[in-house]
């Protein structure tokens, strides 16, 4: 089915009304993005050329408003460099009329989006006890030297040692960016932090007038400094969090140059970033000369032409810029993954082999290991009464609110001097401890639910606290209910290394299958995203709560926002090592060398001790030292993506405008399963068989590869040919994968397997995902 302009707009309005989050966004704002696709600039983009584009935007909108002056007042962004479009204050009827214009690809509301280390690089094998072996990708890729990594986030704290420029040479001459500090004299860039910009007009269109404190790329949240330093922070020795996790903090490409694009601001109804600002930042980062763009934010899955991150990523890919995105923090439910365009690298989150342990010791002598980064501790070996928080319920509070330890839900008379057991969920984990402390409680135990299982997060609690697995939480609750005077002690936090099993998928990590394009497996890869230590801001506390007076220059945070920049840093290394490789080749190297095994070894598990699937980890857990020498890659170009969009239902005229060139869809249209992706997904094996085509390119020495297949349950897989002989670098070979339902098959739903090409030196693995 083709998506016409009218249908696309009506579909978007339907999605808006289906989502309460988007209802709030559209009620707060009558601002829209009008997207025309790509520019047709020839050669260097001059100021005059950009001014001419801006004038055409005023003329275009003026033709609808009846006044060029009104159009000029309405437009608050003109995208004039690589992305062609504008953001403006429009009413719904006018937006709908504009969407019908043949030159318009899409019109969509200025939607709100969400923001989605000392040990992690050791865990990934780039170093061992601060020693960098010759096999490390760091050595082979010169630590990412002079690659430019841009970060779309909450800005940057420029004073952080992670962004010092000692030992760096001149800024690369190809860099065109600026340090936008005209209204913040305290903000300075250098040879490491080579650029910083801020974009807040879309945010202002949604929330109203902003004061002068918003006119700076300075990070007042901490998220942006953390993600940027994870991707490319310098080596900073002696870093710890309240004495825990001591070591040298560093990013994946520590010798890369970095640029911060501030697009996220104080939350409004839980959302921090807006489409109009995100598009403006992409347009700037592409023009400025970024090699890698890291994007730890996203929204609800939607049509690619109505998705600011997908649009910006496509225009970046046209300029051979690698774009890495977080998968989202809406797990463990299926089909929650965001940022699912095939021209993006989408990253899930998993644990590493370090934990910040804090034990709960009960009066019966039982010990239960939890995790915490509390900055205070109970007196040594002193026990206190322990009780379920629901039994400390305030008179006017609900039992559920008390169970969750919401602010104001606890009776101080019942709480004083006790350790309270609070249920994880709904309100913030640190906020729960705050509620206990305000009630006079001495400590807190945070109970996991069945859904969060073994997923433990070390938080900087404001009182002695620890978080327990669901199994241990049940045992503690049973002790409390069966003991006349239950007592307990919480031990101080400590750092434990070599944890097994690791990695484990984080329960919050969003999962596939993609609801936008189920033929593409998303996420693509997983990386460390739990309790990652990296740079922070000096402006707020480690909990980001106003009641917390503590300040840290480094912090431990969890989320796919943290795993995303790990892959961004690795992409930076590969860009340094192989500057001519396409973004697709870099993604392929990362995916096909990943592992699906933990350090026991056994299959990677989820937070409930079940075997995880590719819908959680994609191709697997990243292995950077193997990614630098993948042997073969699955490559893709812009034409491949455009043909994919044709097959997805977009019409040729839309796609031509989107790409900036006249484009004719291939005839016949390609099968969606035949996009040359490093994974193979057949979302509906209803016919007798499906044949999938793939092409691999040799990026190593001449070699003979043979294939091995692990069949998904109930599916027989044949590969033709079964061997590929490569005689030179750059040589390409095509093979077919035939998938057939097995006779007598009883399997239903999704099943999983793998296809591996090997020459005994390289192992080029692709996951196979089939729905029966």
Curated annotation (Swiss-Prot):
Q: Single GO cellular component annotation?
A: extracellular region
Q: What is its main location?
A: secreted
Which key words are in the record?
A: Cell wall, Glycoprotein, Hydrolase, Protease, Secreted, Serine protease, Signal
Q: Where is the signal peptide?
A: 1-25
**Molecular function terms in GO for this entry?**
serine-type endopeptidase activity
**Where does the PA domain start and stop, copy by copy?**
398-480
Glycosylation sites per record: 211, 246, 306, 396, 606, 651, 662, 684, 725
Q: Name one Pfam family in it.
A: Inhibitor_I9
Where does the record place the Peptidase S8 domain? 120-628
SUPFAM superfamilies hit by this protein: Subtilisin-like
Inducing stimuli: Induced between 4 and 8 hours after treatment with auxin and remains high for at least 24 hours.
Q: Where in the cell is it found?
A: Secreted; Secreted, Cell wall
Inhibitor I9 domain boundaries: 31-116
The cross-references to CDD domains, in alphabetical order and at most eight, read: PA_subtilisin_like, Peptidases_S8_3
Matching entries from InterPro entries are given as: PA_domain, Peptidase_S8/S53_dom, Peptidase_S8/S53_dom_sf, Peptidase_S8_Ser-AS, Peptidase_S8_subtilisin-rel, Peptidases_S8_3, S8pro/Inhibitor_I9, S8pro/Inhibitor_I9_sf
Domain of life from the UniProt record: Eukaryota
One example of a Gene Ontology biological process annotation: lateral root morphogenesis
Task: Give a short account of what the protein does.
Answer: Serine protease. Has a substrate preference for the hydrophobic residues Phe and Ala and the basic residue Asp in the P1 position, and for Asp, Leu or Ala in the P1' position. May play a role in the degradation of structural proteins in the extracellular matrix of cells located above sites of lateral root formation and thus facilitate lateral root emergence.
Q: Which family does it belong to?
A: Belongs to the peptidase S8 family.
Entry protein name: Subtilisin-like protease SBT5.3
Q: Which organism does this record belong to?
A: Arabidopsis thaliana
């Amino acid at each position: 089915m083709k998506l016409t302009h009218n249908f696309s707009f009506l579909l978007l309005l339907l999605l808006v009304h289906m989502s309460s989050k988007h209802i709030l966004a559209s009620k707060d704002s009558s601002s829209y993005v009008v997207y025309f696709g790509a520019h047709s600039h020839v050669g260097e983009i001059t100021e005059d050329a950009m001014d001419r584009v801006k004038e055409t935007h005023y003329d275009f909108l003026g033709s609808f408003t009846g006044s060029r002056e009104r159009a000029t007042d309405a437009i608050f962004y003109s995208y004039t460099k690589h992305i062609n479009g504008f953001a403006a204050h429009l009413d719904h009827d006018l937006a709908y009329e504009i969407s019908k214009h043949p030159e318009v690809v899409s019109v969509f509301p200025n939607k709100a989006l969400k923001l989605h280390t000392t040990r992690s690089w050791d865990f990934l094998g780039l170093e061992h006890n601060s020693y960098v072996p010759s096999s490390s990708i760091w050595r082979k890729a010169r630590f990412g030297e002079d690659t430019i990594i841009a970060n779309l986030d909450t800005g940057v704290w420029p004073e952080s040692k992670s962004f010092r420029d000692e030992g760096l040479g001149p800024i690369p001459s190809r860099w065109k960016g600026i340090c936008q500090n005209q209204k913040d004299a305290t903000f300075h860039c250098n040879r490491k932090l080579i650029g910083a910009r801020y974009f807040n007009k879309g945010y202002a269109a949604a929330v109203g007038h902003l004061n002068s404190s918003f006119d700076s790329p300075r990070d007042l949240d901490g998220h942006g400094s953390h993600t940027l330093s994870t991707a490319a922070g310098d080596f900073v020795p002696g870093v710890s969090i309240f004495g825990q996790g001591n070591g040298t903090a560093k990013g994946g490409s520590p010798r890369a140059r970095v640029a911060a694009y501030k697009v996220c601001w104080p939350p409004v109804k839980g959302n921090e970033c807006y489409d109009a600002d995100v598009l403006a930042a992409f347009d700037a980062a592409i023009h400025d000369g970024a090699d890698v763009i890291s994007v730890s934010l996203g929204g609800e899955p939607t049509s690619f032409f109505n998705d600011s991150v997908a649009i910006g990523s496509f225009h970046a890919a046209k300029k051979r810029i690698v774009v890495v995105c977080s998968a989202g923090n809406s797990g463990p439910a299926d089909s929650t993954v965001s940022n699912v365009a095939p021209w993006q690298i989408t990253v899930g989150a998993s644990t590493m082999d370090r934990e910040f342990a804090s034990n709960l010791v009960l009066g019966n002598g039982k010990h239960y290991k939890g995790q915490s980064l509390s900055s205070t501790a109970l007196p040594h070996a002193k026990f206190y009464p322990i009780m379920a928080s629901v039994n400390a319920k305030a008179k006017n509070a609900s039992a559920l609110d008390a169970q969750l330890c919401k602010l104001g839900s606890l009776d101080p008379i019942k709480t004083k001097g006790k350790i309270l057991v609070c249920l994880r969920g709904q309100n913030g984990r640190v906020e729960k401890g705050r509620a206990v402390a305000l009630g006079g409680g001495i400590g807190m135990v945070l109970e996991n639910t069945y859904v969060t299982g073994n997923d433990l997060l070390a938080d900087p609690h404001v009182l002695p606290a620890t978080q327990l697995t669901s199994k241990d939480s049940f045992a503690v609750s049973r002790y409390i209910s069966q003991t006349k005077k239950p007592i307990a002690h919480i031990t101080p936090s400590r750092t434990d290394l070599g944890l097994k099993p690791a990695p484990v998928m984080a329960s919050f990590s969003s999962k596939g299958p993609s609801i936008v394009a189920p033929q593409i497996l998303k996420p693509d890869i997983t990386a460390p995203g739990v309790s990652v230590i990296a740079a922070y801001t000096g402006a707020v506390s480690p909990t980001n709560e106003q009641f917390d007076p503590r300040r840290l220059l480094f912090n431990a945070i969890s989320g796919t926002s943290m795993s995303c920049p790990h892959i961004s840093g690795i992409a930076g290394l590969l860009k340094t090592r192989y500057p001519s490789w396409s973004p697709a080749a870099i993604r392929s190297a990362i995916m096909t060398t990943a592992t699906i095994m933990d350090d026991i070894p056994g299959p990677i598990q989820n937070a409930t001790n079940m075997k995880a699937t590719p819908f959680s980890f994609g191709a697997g857990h990243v292995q950077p030292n193997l990614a630098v020498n993948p042997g073969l890659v699955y490559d893709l170009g812009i034409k491949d993506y455009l043909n994919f969009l044709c097959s997805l239902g977009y019409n040729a005229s839309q796609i031509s405008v989107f790409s900036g060139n006249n484009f004719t869809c291939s005839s016949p249209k390609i099968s969606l399963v035949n996009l040359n992706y490093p994974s193979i997904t057949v979302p509906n094996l209803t016919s007798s068989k499906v044949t999938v085509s793939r092409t691999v390119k040799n990026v190593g020495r001449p070699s003979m590869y043979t294939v091995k297949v692990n069949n998904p349950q109930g599916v027989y897989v044949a590969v033709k040919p079964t061997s590929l002989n490569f005689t030179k670098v750059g040589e390409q070979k095509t093979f077919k994968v035939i998938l057939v339902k097995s006779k007598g098959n009883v399997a239903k739903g999704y099943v999983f397997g793998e296809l591996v090409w090997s020459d005994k030196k390289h192992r080029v693995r692709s996951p196979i995902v089939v729905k029966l």
